[in-house]
Regions:
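Gram-negative outer-membrane beta-barrel transporters
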Residues: 244, 491-494, 591-593, 614-695, ...
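Face-selective signature of the C-terminal outer-membrane beta-barrel domain
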Residues: 292, 349-371, 385-510, 521-523, ...
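Extracytoplasmic beta-strand/coil segments of soluble accessory domains associated
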Residues: 130, 147-189, 206
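Periplasmic-side early beta-strands and strand-to-turn transitions of outer-membrane beta-barrels
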Residues: 244-383
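Short acidic/polar hinge/loop motifs at secondary-structure boundaries
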Residues: 69, 185-212, 230-233
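Outer-membrane beta-barrel signature, preferentially recognizing the C-terminal barrel domain
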Residues: 382-397, 429-430, 443, 477-479, ...
Length: 784
């Protein structure tokens, strides 16, 4: 009996050992083709089937190496993926080692995106048209901040300077219809829909994903025009430390050699802050724990912009049918210069990722942002902003059935008026948002990507701008919304995809609203794709549009309207694209049809100017966009975009300030060797002529009439040039000139109206140095 047991036991051990004996090791080495530098953090997926079902994964180390175990016999298939590179696929033969070289994805068609569907997939396989802009490419191109980068890289986007700061518009829609997200989360602290865009650290961004059109199905009522999602970095290296500094020419020197004895010393000093930036990005990956820390400091000087001629108002017969002919009135006095504020700000962000075991991922994050804004008004005060964000996200996968994600996000923004000479400040604005979210995604059913979710948004605003007088009493207004959404992306076969979904929005103020969406993608071949999309958008009035009532420096009143109704829009688009290894082109035509669109309009009451919010009857926007990318002669890449939009008039009046035509173009040159890289970028952005009407009053024969004068702003082109050199893959030096042909706007406004113009003082040079600290330390250690 004992002998039988021994035989059975030995047989069991032999059976268990057979799989071990049938395995062999294969070592992968992944490097960049042109420089032969190791690619760290490349993901190698392998399986015993060509479709890579039920795969295993490994990640390359600091030397670009990873080892896998494969069967002694039979085929094994692999895929290598790394951000910014073309993926590699192949079959593992009898070799015990493989050295593979990856090439840069200059066409950007293999980027993995999440914004359009909230599920990760390569951009070329997404049913929703998505533009991806790499963060590294923006820094290398010499852009100083996010607004300059988006203006140049995004077709149809217009970022201009107005009285309260920057103003963004896209496809004829202003910032109230463009939802900015950071890692998928909302932000607060906006003015007329515009955030403090200085809070976005360009050096902390991994990529930017832009989805145009009504995206309300997944992102709610603020996404009726577009979604811009800033995805921040997450290091894949054991140690990753980068530090840099950027110096730029001053726009204008307002005060030479200010003395500390001067009564206005702090004002003079703040007005002429240096155009200086510095940053540190540090992270580590220790297996189960990954940390990412980013710190950014920036300052810029204040300057004046001057109008070449006196104010001119042209009252056209088209906008004022009661006139017998066009009337032109020219001011006898010169227009005062327009001041552009200087800023000084610092931002700090921290993310910690913890993966305790295979199916669980935990993220905790927080950030802080402080900004001083220095105007050129000698009133002994300046504006100060403070923002805190914090949140957590937990993701758990139940086998291959479904994945559940729970998150909490909060953003806390304050604005102050601070005294220049004494340590005293007064809070004038407090905004808080809190958003819990729960979602379930599943790929259990073959060909289907399902997502189901529910979220709640609590928005509280405290300000002294609800009173209608100069009492400065702080009051609080709130809006609460609860939303649920469902979406399915169905891959029918290799050629067809369908995405359909619906979102419901409920608030006590405006009741229940449902927003459907459906999108189709047809790929007749691997090079061609067609996309068609319909979606319903919805935007409820903001707290400011409902309740604001304040006097702007005695110049005019800004008045909300508690009778506002939510605006609705129907968005349709049809687009096509073609791509191969060296060429990409896409075109898209769209229509955006609004009902009860919320707009701010000027009203004149006995020469008292009011800016009031109202629902327009309807407004239609028809447009087209084209994007082209061409890589040629191994070293050159040409990029070009064009955007056209036609905005319907309201009773013959054009209140929209968007230019119908906009275009961008750039030519990039890259020369790469093992220990040296050279890159040069020449870029240009074109903005067409703008024509719009502004309400005013006009006296004719002693009788005062409501009237509209026409603003006509000329077309212009801004060009930039930057040259970047990388030495030993450790030190980057960039030299460039912004606005190289020295364009300066000549028309700034008329009357109390300030036009949206590019805030530039002319051609300015900059120098930037960035050091890969961890690579330098590693090199020094090797020498020892």
């Amino acid at each position: 009996m004992k002998t039988i047991r021994k035989v059975m036991f030995m047989g069991l051990l032999l059976l268990l050992a057979l799989p071990m004996a049938a395995q062999r090791k294969v070592k992968f080495t992944i490097a960049e083709k042109t420089t032969e530098q190791p690619i760290i953090g490349a993901v190698i997926t392998y399986a015993d089937n060509e479709k890579l079902k039920s795969p295993q994964r490994v990640v390359t180390n600091m030397d670009g190496e990873a080892t896998i175990s494969v069967p002694q016999s039979g085929k094994c298939y692999y895929q290598v993926v790394s951000v910014g590179y073309n993926p590699l696929r192949g079959t593992i033969g009898n070799d015990s080692s493989l050295k593979l070289f990856m090439t840069e994805d200059v066409m950007k068609v293999n980027e993995v995106v999440v914004t359009g569907s909230r599920t990760a997939r390569p951009i070329k396989l997404s049913p929703v048209s998505t533009q991806v802009i790499g963060g590294k490419e923006l820094v290398d191109a010499g852009y100083a901040d996010l607004t300059k980068a988006l203006q140049q890289e995004t077709p149809g986007m217009n970022i201009q300077k107005v009285g309260f700061g920057n103003e963004i518009s896209m496809q004829g829609l202003d910032a109230r219809h463009v939802l900015f997200l950071q890692d998928g989360e909302r932000l607060t602290g906006d003015m007329a829909g515009n955030l403090d865009y200085e809070r976005f650290n360009l050096h902390a961004i991994d990529r930017i994903e832009i989805v145009k059109g009504a995206s309300s199905t997944l992102y709610g009522s603020r996404a009726s025009g577009a979604v811009i999602n800033l995805i921040t970095k997450k290091t894949t290296k054991p140690i990753d430390i980068q530090a840099g500094v950027r110096w730029g020419q001053m726009n204008e020197t307002n005060y030479k050699n200010p003395s500390k004895k001067d009564f206005l010393y702090m004002f003079e000093k703040n007005a002429d802050r240096p155009n200086l930036q510095s940053w540190v990005s540090a992270g580590f990956n220790a297996g189960k724990v990954t940390s990412q820390t980013d710190v950014w400091y920036s300052s810029s000087d204040a300057f004046y912009m001057y109008q070449a001629e006196n104010d001119k108002k042209v009252y056209t017969q088209e906008a004022n049918p009661w006139l017998d002919h066009d009337v032109t009135i020219t001011s006898v006095a010169s227009r005062p210069p327009m001041s552009i504020e200087g800023t000084e700000h610092i931002s700090v962000s921290q993310k910690v990722f913890y993966d305790p075991f295979k199916n669980l991922e935990i993220l905790a994050y927080g950030s802080a942002f402080y900004m001083n804004t220095y105007d050129l008004i000698q009133d002994m005060t300046f504006s100060q902003a403070r923002d805190w964000t914090a949140g957590t996200k937990i993701k758990y996968s139940f086998k291959d059935w479904f994945q559940i994600t729970a998150s909490l996000h909060g953003d806390f923004y304050d604005r102050f008026k601070r005294h220049e000479r004494i340590d005293e400040r007064t809070k004038v604005y407090k905004s808080r948002i809190f958003q819990p979210r729960l979602s379930i995604t599943s790929q259990k059913f073959e060909g289907h990507d399902l997502i189901l979710g529910i979220e709640h948004l609590s928005d509280d605003l405290t300000s002294d701008r609800f009173n209608g007088d100069a009492s400065h009493i702080m009051r609080t207004r709130s809006l609460k919304e609860t939303e649920a959404f469902l979406q399915d992306e169905w891959t029918m076969n290799d050629h067809w995809m369908v995405s359909a979904g619906v979102r419901t929005n409920f608030s006590r103020a405006f009741g229940l609203m449902a927003m459907p969406k459906i999108a189709f993608k047809w790929s007749p071949s691997e090079h061609w794709a067609w996309r068609a999309n319909y979606s319903m958008g919805y935007r409820s009035p903001s707290i400011k549009e409902l309740f604001f009532n304040w006097d702007h420096l005695g110049m005019f009143m800004i008045k909300g309207n508690e009778d506002l109704k939510p605006e609705k829009n129907n968005y349709v688009s049809l687009g096509t694209e073609y791509s191969n290894d060296n060429f990409f082109i896409s075109g898209n035509v769209y229509g955006n049809f609004f009902r009860k669109k919320i707009e701010g309009v000027w009203r004149i009451y006995d020469m008292q100017y009011n800016f009031e919010y109202t629902n327009l009857s309807n407004q239609n926007l028809i447009g087209l966009e084209a994007i082209m990318r061409w890589h040629f002669l191994n070293h050159f890449t040409m990029n070009a975009t064009y955007s056209y939009v036609n905005v319907s008039k309201t009773d013959g009046i054009q209140v929209n300030t968007t230019s119908p035509h906009a275009a961008t173009a750039s030519l990039d040159y890259k020369y790469n060797k093992k220990n040296y890289r050279l890159g040069a970028t020449f870029s240009a952005s074109y903005m067409g002529e703008k024509k719009f009407d502004v309400q005013d009053r006009l006296s004719v024969n002693g009788e005062s009439h409501d009237a509209y004068f026409r603003c006509q702003l000329p077309q212009y082109v801004l060009c930039n040039l930057s040259v970047i050199q990388t030495f030993y893959n450790k030190v980057k030096v960039t030299v460039g000139v912004d606005n190289i042909f020295n364009y300066v706007p000549k028309t700034l406004g008329s009357g109390i109206t300030m036009f949206n113009v590019p805030a530039t003082a002319g051609a300015k040079a900059h120098v930037q140095v960035e050091v890969l600290v961890d690579e330098l330390v590693k090199a020094f250690r090797k020498k020892k």
